[in-house]
Amino acid sequence: MSAPDAERRVTERKTLRTRATIILGQTQAFEVRTLDLSTGGMGIVAQANPRPGTLMGIRFMLPLKPGGYHPFEARAKVAHSVYSASEQGFKIGLSFIDLSPEAAAAAQRFVSG
């Protein structure tokens, strides 16, 4: 079964393999692996299986050329989560919420670069 048109990815994505931290609530922080990034969201792999609609923060260092690594921080909502044996964890699709202009510009620069 396919996702409704409103939930389908509409932005270009680029592979991004790095470590990130997700923040749930005010105090819970977990390390995850990233898969890809777009201006609309990103894919991650985690050991936990969050429900669709779960809100979280995410932060990591984004590699940008030229200039090296830049901090990236965003609020996001879980769009989907499914177990992946090949990734040894849950592949989670995140949709960004109210991405700051700085974060949006950095994501666009990364995807375009």
Region spans (language model):
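Conserved hydrophobic positions within beta-strands
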Residues: 34, 76-78
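Beta-strand-rich interaction surfaces with strong enrichment in secreted/lumenal proteins
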Residues: 45-48, 63
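Short, Lys/Arg- and Gly-enriched loop/turn segments at beta-strand edges
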Residues: 63-73
